[in-house]
Regions:
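Structural signature of PLP-dependent enzymes
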Residues: 1-4
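General beta-strand structural signal in soluble alpha/beta enzymes
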Residues: 19-22, 107-109
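Conserved C-terminal structural/oligomerization subdomain of aldehyde/semialdehyde dehydrogenase
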Residues: 27, 34-157
């Protein structure tokens, strides 16, 4: 996994991104799977680091020209498991969150899974839902039985 994350950081550099912080192995930890938390600037949404799941501590900073452009960039992804919106204006944050194509969205914080709320992604981020009533349905096999009139509950009335 460490090799994979380091490969993505190298790809980003080769494509013109700049490492703002991190990008290597933590000092004093030459062994193990550790990679420094890394921030990449100058990332374009067409770069692999912006389009693929890295599964490591890498944050890509992608510039935008306002809310509409930010939503366009965020939705221009084959994935949509979860997202986050940060805004000093809660109504603006909610308006933006409603436009994002992700299965769950946090506004000004994190979104922990709640047992009673469905969890799952859009697009290529998973199939179906976990948790909540929607998650239960995948474990059920509903069926219907047609009853003759004599066996119906209201037959004696």
């Amino acid at each position: 996994q460490r090799t994979r994350v380091e490969h993505y950081i190298a790809l980003a550099r080769d494509a013109g991104a700049r490492v703002v912080t991190g990008g290597g192995r933590p000092a004093g930890l030459p062994r193990g799977w550790y990679v420094e938390p890394t921030i990449l600037a100058g990332v374009d949404n067409a770069m692999r680091v912006a389009r693929e799941e890295i599964f490591g501590p890498v944050l890509c900073l992608i510039p935008h020209d306002g809310d509409d452009d930010a939503v366009r960039i965020a939705n221009d992804s084959p994935y949509g498991l979860s997202g986050g919106v940060w805004s000093a204006d809660a109504e603006r944050g909610l308006a933006i969150a409603k436009r994002l194509r992700t299965g769950s969205i946090a506004i000004n914080g994190t979104y922990p899974p709640f047992p009673r709320v469905p969890f799952g992604g859009f697009k290529e981020s998973g199939l179906g839902r976990e948790l909540g009533p929607d998650g239960l349905h995948s474990f059920l096999e509903p069926r219907s039985i047609g009853l003759p009139a004599a066996l119906r509950p209201d037959a004696g009335n």
